[in-house]
Amino acid sequence: QDGQEVDGPVHLGQQGAAFTAVDPCEAREEEALQVNGAAVGTLAESCNRHGVLLIHVSTDYVFDGTSPRPYLETDLVAPMGVYGHSKWEGEEAVRKRLHHHLIIRVSWVFGVHGNNFVKTMLRLAREREALEVVADQRGGPTYAGHIAALILHLYGRTLEQGSTGWGTYHFCGSPVTSWHAFAEA
């Protein structure tokens, strides 16, 4: 609520709400752009007005996936679909409205909560005799708990040391693998 109903000072904004269902984003473009783009811009404006650090979580979907090497933060983006485009819009909204921000691009997120690849594979393994999983896409499966720990670390470092290296960072698990190999594991 724009910091108006908070009892005490606010030092950190962490954008956690997102429309992350890639395929449904294609059919619901306006909603994806609103949630992943415009709403993020509104949050960034509020953080700017109140002097709050914003940590925004984005995605590797801002790239087209054709690079033979891991993407660098300085690589040009080329989102292929609505989801990637909407997340890029969110990143740009943060950059335009707020100098003090951290954008963390993650990939292949899995964890205990929510829908994700690991939970889907476990469910399908119970329901089917055999599974077919693509082997031509590579990435770094990233445990959601590690992302949370990184956010806490970055926030703690900012509190202790003051200004830090604002900008965009990539964070993913290792080793890099294919969806097929990840499913087999």
Predicted regions and their residues:
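Mid/C-terminal beta-alpha module of Rossmann-like enzyme folds, strongest
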Residues: 150, 157-185
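SDR active-site strand-loop-helix element
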Residues: 13-16, 54-59, 64, 104-106
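NAD(P)H-binding glycine-rich loop region in Rossmannoid oxidoreductase-like domains
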Residues: 1-35
